[in-house]
Amino acid sequence: MSVISMKQLLEAGVHFGHQTRRWNPKMAPYIFTERNGIYIIDLQQTVEKLEQAYEFVKKLAMEGGTILFVGTKKQAQDSIKEEAERCGMFYVNQRWLGGTLTNFKTIRGRIQRLKELKKMEEDGTFDVLPKKEVIKLRKEKERLQKFLGGIENMQSLPSALFIVDPKKEAIAVAEARSLEIPIVAIVDTNCDPELIDYPIPGNDDAIRAVKLITSKIADAVIEGNQGEQFAASEE
């Protein structure tokens, strides 16, 4: 039973690439044809590549690994958050803060600050502070929550990244590569697939296409986690 059907991919518009003038020649092997100035992605390869990515993610989750879901473009923000939360993983869906991976210690410090502010709000500290200061602290908390909320409980570097539009998330790609963290990504016709360990050729601009593929990656995590629980109960 394959992970995804051609019908699902077609209905979600996964086959629509970018305009032909905005392309990366390295994506040529994944292009089926050109129609009305737009490249059409070869969905047979999408099926194959998604299956490879699915197996990789499932095995990783089975071994207790973690995945960081990354997608900050408007079309990806909701899917990234929803699917990462559904499978109990971490996400970045606002702005990628430079150093999120390569300077993780500093990022952990900012997360610690977020936790402190949350605690202050909960234990009544805010009630006894001057109103002006509380407004300032609440603003700081909201800002930290916005950018770091999705990685608040990420204790160490992730085992892998799942990225929507690696061209837009070039900093995340560079950081993961420098730390040799494997990358799974949806690569559209304007991306460089050679930078990605598990490229999934597909439309990274349509909400439905992004949601479909992101949900399959989350499914792989869930399936892998069930395998991990099963293995633990067998011991």
From Swiss-Prot:
The keyword Plastid does not apply. This is Small ribosomal subunit protein uS2. The keyword Kinase does not apply. GO terms for biological process: translation. Belongs to the universal ribosomal protein uS2 family. One of its GO terms (molecular function) is structural constituent of ribosome. Keywords: Ribonucleoprotein, Ribosomal protein. CDD domains: RPS2. One of its GO terms (cellular component) is cytosolic small ribosomal subunit. PANTHER family: 30S RIBOSOMAL PROTEIN S2 PROKARYOTIC AND ORGANELLAR, SMALL RIBOSOMAL SUBUNIT PROTEIN US2M. It comes from Thermoanaerobacter sp. (strain X514). InterPro entries: Ribosomal_uS2, Ribosomal_uS2_bac/mit/plastid, Ribosomal_uS2_CS, Ribosomal_uS2_flav_dom_sf.
